[in-house]
């Protein structure tokens, strides 16, 4: 099995990249793909850049050039579920856009024409992630993760997300675009991120302070998940 891993920012990929053996780097379309072995398992790690377009472009390049069997999206996220704290893990069972609106033509809020309203994560990947969470004794929540091209740092944006997606557990800027591409390529995916901030008016301060904590936790989870998928 070859496992694809996608993170948006340098801080979100550096810990994993440094552990890849026999590493080779491909720079393409503003993205970087690192291939090699992570604890003996073939991986292709992508640093995509921030936002939905960068994530979709990167995911497509990774699938075409890295040929992974599954995709894990890692990194940081803003917490929406009330129980989440900085460093906790979120696992997607579904991903949706929070900034897409074609409701004038009868679509659900967040749904794009020709697409499902949400993109379902793979059940086996979810189960493997939850097994890793239990083994590592981490605090985690599974549920809907929503994405959009905005860092949520104020009451208006937060209220809109809570109104349209009251069940959402976390918000970030890439996961749904990656899920969308995986859906089109029929490649299983799961989002496994760590909380860097609680989405509120002070979230930008929390993000700057705790990004390193989130990156460490998400990298720990992904490394464990890669082992679980490769060896059971």
From Swiss-Prot:
Binding annotation for substrate: 78, 152, 173-174
Reaction equation(s) it catalyzes: S-adenosyl-L-homocysteine + H2O = S-(5-deoxy-D-ribos-5-yl)-L-homocysteine + adenine; S-methyl-5'-thioadenosine + H2O = 5-(methylsulfanyl)-D-ribose + adenine; 5'-deoxyadenosine + H2O = 5-deoxy-D-ribose + adenine
Entry EC no(s): 3.2.2.9
Pathway: Amino-acid biosynthesis; L-methionine biosynthesis via salvage pathway; S-methyl-5-thio-alpha-D-ribose 1-phosphate from S-methyl-5'-thioadenosine (hydrolase route): step 1/2
Gene Ontology CC terms: cytosol
An individual GO BP term: L-methionine salvage from S-adenosylmethionine
Keyword Amino-acid biosynthesis: yes
InterPro entries for this protein: MTA_SAH_Nsdase, Nucleoside_phosphorylase_d, Nucleoside_phosphorylase_sf
The entry's keywords: Amino-acid biosynthesis, Hydrolase, Methionine biosynthesis
Role noted for this protein: Catalyzes the irreversible cleavage of the glycosidic bond in both 5'-methylthioadenosine (MTA) and S-adenosylhomocysteine (SAH/AdoHcy) to adenine and the corresponding thioribose, 5'-methylthioribose and S-ribosylhomocysteine, respectively. Also cleaves 5'-deoxyadenosine, a toxic by-product of radical S-adenosylmethionine (SAM) enzymes, into 5-deoxyribose and adenine. Thus, is required for in vivo function of the radical SAM enzymes biotin synthase and lipoic acid synthase, that are inhibited by 5'-deoxyadenosine accumulation.
Name of the protein in question: 5'-methylthioadenosine/S-adenosylhomocysteine nucleosidase
Natural source organism: Shigella boydii serotype 4 (strain Sb227)
Phylogenetic placement of the source organism: Bacteria, Pseudomonadati, Pseudomonadota, Gammaproteobacteria, Enterobacterales
């Amino acid at each position: 099995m070859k496992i694809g891993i996608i993170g948006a920012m340098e801080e979100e990929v550096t810990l994993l990249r440094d552990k890849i053996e026999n590493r080779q780097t491909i720079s393409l379309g503003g993205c970087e793909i690192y291939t090699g072995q992570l604890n003996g398992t073939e991986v292709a790690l992508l640093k995509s850049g921030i936002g939905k377009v960068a994530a979709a472009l990167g995911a497509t390049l990774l699938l075409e050039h890295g040929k992974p069997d599954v995709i894990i999206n890692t990194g940081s996220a803003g917490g929406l579920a009330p129980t989440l704290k900085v460093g906790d893990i979120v696992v997607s069972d579904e991903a949706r856009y929070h900034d897409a609106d074609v409701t004038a033509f009868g679509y659900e809020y967040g749904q794009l024409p020709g697409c499902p309203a949400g993109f379902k994560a793979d059940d086996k990947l979810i189960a493997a992630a939850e097994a890793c969470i239990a083994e590592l004794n981490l605090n985690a929540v599974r549920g809907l993760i929503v994405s959009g091209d905005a860092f949520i740092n104020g009451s208006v944006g937060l209220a809109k997300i809570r109104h349209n997606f009251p069940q959402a557990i976390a918000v970030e800027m890439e996961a749904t675009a990656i899920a969308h591409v995986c859906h089109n390529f029929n490649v299983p995916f799961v989002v496994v991120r760590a909380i860097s901030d609680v989405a509120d008016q002070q979230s930008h301060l929390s993000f700057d302070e705790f990004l390193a904590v989130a990156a460490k936790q998400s990298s720990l989870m992904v490394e464990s998940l890669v082992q679980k998928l490769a060896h059971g």
